[in-house]
Each structure stands twice: as structure tokens, then as C-alpha cells.
């Protein structure tokens, strides 16, 4: 029987510069999260894509989450390689950390949802298009911007 746990997948933003350079890159990076989750049979609890790197809170078996990480990296690098010249090379090396306790789980969930809006962007987490904040904070009576 597979034991499911929570995992935090992320990349070091300093190493992954040029990960996103256009709106179509944001859209593709966010969509890859769903494709990988479906393909690997894991649940995405929270996610955000910043211009330098992704953050994803996953729930599933270790092997499935490890495959998710590898698939996301390889799909991202293929996407970037097909659309850019070598001057925009990207190093994308994701980490996968098992979440051991409730305090860390809450910290990762909050960080994942709000981090993309903390770097001087004049936007709230519920309005950030490339994260799951709107799914947590929007009123049921509010029409999502997308």
C-alpha cells in the first residue's frame, strides 16, 4: 500500500533566472503543473509560478511526487529549449521535500500562495493569475478574472 504524504517541490530562484520571460511562459509553466499532476496521479494542494521559479505543494506517494518533479523539470526545459536561443539558457533543478509536521505544512501552504506577490508586486494573492490563491481567498460570489 502506498503511503501518501505532503511534499514541497520548488526550485532555487537564483539558479533559475530566465525561467519566465513572457506571459506565454507563465501560462505554459502553470499549465504544466496540471499536466504533471494528472499524469502522476498526485494532488496539487497549492501552487504558484514566479518569474524565476515554481512552488508546488503536493499530496501523494513519494514515487509519484518524485516523477512529478522530474516530469516538470524535463517538460519545462524542453519548452524553454524549443522557444528560446541559448542566451536565455535556464538551469532548473527542483527540490522535493517531505513535509513532516502540521506547522511546516501550514507554512509551506501559506508561502506557496503568497510568495509570488511579496516581491514588490502591487497585487494580492487572490488576484495573482499564476497561483492558486484565488481558489482559497475569493468569495463564491466573485467572478474570477480569468
Give the location of each predicted region.
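Short Pro-Cys-Gly-centered "Cys-loop" motif that presents a nucleophilic cysteine in a tight turn
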Residues: 1-52, 59-146
Amino acid at each position: 500500500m502506498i503511503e501518501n504524504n505532503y511534499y514541497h517541490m520548488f526550485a532555487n530562484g537564483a539558479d533559475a533566472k530566465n525561467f519566465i520571460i513572457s506571459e506565454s511562459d507563465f501560462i505554459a509553466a502553470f499549465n504544466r503543473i496540471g499536466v504533471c499532476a494528472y499524469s502522476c496521479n498526485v494532488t496539487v494542494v497549492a501552487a504558484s509560478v514566479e518569474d524565476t521559479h515554481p512552488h508546488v505543494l503536493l499530496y501523494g506517494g513519494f514515487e509519484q511526487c518524485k516523477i512529478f518533479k522530474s516530469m516538470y523539470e524535463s517538460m519545462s526545459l524542453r519548452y524553454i529549449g524549443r522557444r528560446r536561443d541559448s542566451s536565455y539558457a535556464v538551469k532548473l533543478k527542483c527540490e522535493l521535500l517531505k513535509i513532516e509536521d502540521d506547522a511546516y505544512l501550514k507554512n509551506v501552504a501559506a508561502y506557496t500562495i503568497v510568495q509570488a506577490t511579496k516581491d514588490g508586486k502591487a497585487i494580492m494573492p487572490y488576484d495573482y493569475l499564476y497561483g492558486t490563491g484565488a481558489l482559497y481567498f475569493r468569495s463564491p460570489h466573485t467572478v474570477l478574472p480569468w
